[in-house]
């Protein structure tokens, strides 16, 4: 299902002032912009995500009459500019890594090639639409690694930074490997399995915990019951007692622990359930979890079968931003690049080649786009003349499958939570020469 259209005026003011200046100066030649991360945010890799939303935005880009009226009222823009803006559409090409592809610092996640005004005005939205999903998917992949094959579901909608963020987060986490989400709209929009249990309020609203368990299990046989409203282990005992007394009239598939010492409580709950002859009842844990908490629980032998993970992942609490940039790398056939210290760009349109040894990623090379080097080219043309190509029509399920395959091909050390030796990313001799030429054109600069 198509997401709501991103407004054309979701842009920074200076994109529009530059656009007026470009048109006034006749600067409408072909431009190439790269979107990339300058460094990894306490991660061994990033996981590309958000491309579908970028392509939706570019295909639908149009400035409405109401938009023009608002801009006119600002008193900043010339009438002829506003009329030209009214007719503006995106007609360029887009090259991108497929969603679910691991990537590393300085590698273009996406390249836009279009007339300068078109390529410039979309900067804000393109960065926004790729930044957060990539950040979340990268965090989610770490959670899945920590879970060691156990199920993980997204519980973070209520504390995500806005409605749109919650929906984008659910999609990104599903691509990263989560099994589902509690967010019903995300499930409807992207075909993600929706899951849910019951809240403490439901238990509290009944005369007793036992009554709430009976009523809910009768309404939803095979459900998961939340057992920590009053006393976690007493709640587990209530489940056991009701199962013994009511038999098939009380069908429960799991109990959920949401507070306290989850490791100790899980061990005690497992012992109670097993002693009662209920090994088939699973234990699910939630409450302030992230990859580190999950790894610690499992390292301690906690018999937890699945996890509900919310706040700390949805807001990416340990690294809530990505040092992403959208930079001009070529204009009108001329290489360009930012040359300030610490932010030296790689000029020109590029390709990234990934080499594998025995099925495991062994190193990447960032090259000029027309080079032919060993390895798998990662940047594919996903949009041409403003229209999506087959490579840009991969749905959420397809992106999830691609992520699973690509993550499995990373070296084990990169998939671990601990910092690993940096993955080798080389720059081809031809691209190095292009960068040297760019620096040489500014003699006060030195190559780092």
Residue ranges, per PLM feature:
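Glycine-rich phosphate/ribose-binding loops and adjacent secondary-structure elements
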Residues: 201-361
